[in-house]
Regions:
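Aromatic-lined carbohydrate-recognition surfaces of secreted/lumenal glycan-active proteins
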Residues: 172-178, 220-234, 262-268
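Alpha-helix-loop-beta-strand connector modules within alpha/beta enzyme cores
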Residues: 203-217
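Alpha/beta catalytic barrel-like cores
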Residues: 1-172, 176, 183-201, 214, ...
Length: 270
């Protein structure tokens, strides 16, 4: 492989995973470490397409509230709450769609690899949004948000296990997207349910993502994409320096007792 590698974060504006693998492979093949399926179709909106997880979940109900993204043209989605009598500890997210989609995309990945458009070392990249981001978007009550993050995280780890039972580990990379729901709070440094100080919040967020990292089999490559958002192609808040990203990564490394193959960070604009 080339000494200068290219990392693709997730969404690629082509129509199908097959088109992503074929076109990107032909252009960037030798420089790729791993390749996502492009999050094509309805998934290009990153999280809006996940609303059915909550709308169809028997333990949730609509609040009638709406979430309006900062990005113009982005999908407006609903807000949900637990039904009366439901404890957050009893909630299971066994209706997640990620494994099924990934396994369908992996079949195309294998086919394109056989044509030679993708070099043998390139791994199939499963990219998953942090529970903190997803729960923040779809759950209205902040106390319920905090309580539901571990349950959703366990559901994601189950999805990783399903994919890892089908995709050869030597061909798989799992990337966790740690987005502005984390870093906007760290930048603003205002007390939240995740901690009264920036240091406390960093510990809380690192522990939550450490659990996700430890849910990836040790012989599957583990990646973290640290993100400040891309609404209308702008960060939700600009990092003054990379210090908070580095602090989070160092804390994360103490929580993840295995190799982290890649950490991707944004940089300050100036």
């Amino acid at each position: 492989m080339s000494d200068r590698m290219i990392h693709l974060v997730g969404s690629i504006p082509f129509r199908t995973p097959a088109e992503v693998f074929e076109r990107v492979g032909c252009i960037l093949g030798p420089r790729l470490y791993s390749i996502p399926d492009g999050e094509t179709g309805e998934r290009l909106g990153w999280m809006g397409w996940l609303e059915p997880i909550f709308a169809a979940h028997p333990q949730f109900e609509s609040t009638g509230q709406k979430f309006t993204p900062r990005a113009s043209g982005s999908e407006i989605t609903g807000k949900y709450r637990l039904k009366a009598g439901v404890s957050p500890e009893d909630v299971r997210f066994d209706n997640l769609p990620f494994a099924q989609i990934a396994m369908e995309s992996f079949r195309e990945f294998e086919r394109v690899k056989r044509t030679g458009a993708l070099p043998p070392p390139v791994r199939f990249q499963l990219t998953l949004a942090s529970p903190i981001s997803v729960i923040r978007r779809f759950v209205a009550d902040e106390a319920e948000q905090e309580a539901l993050i571990p349950s959703y995280g366990r559901g994601l780890i189950d999805e990783v296990g399903k994919v890892a039972s089908v995709v050869p580990h030597a061909q798989l990379a799992v990337q966790w997207d740690v987005a502005s729901a984390v870093f906007e709070r760290l930048e603003r440094n205002v007390p939240t349910r995740f901690g009264q100080t920036r240091e406390e919040m960093t510990r809380t967020f690192a522990a939550a993502h450490g659990m996700l990292g430890m849910g990836v089999p040790s012989d599957v490559h583990l990646q973290f994409h640290l993100c400040y958002g891309d609404a209308s192609h702008m960060h939700s808040i600009e990092p003054a320096t990379s210090r908070l990203l580095v602090d989070f990564t160092n804390r994360l490394r103490t929580e993840v007792r295995r190799t982290i193959e890649l950490v991707h960070m944004p940089v300050p604009p100036n």
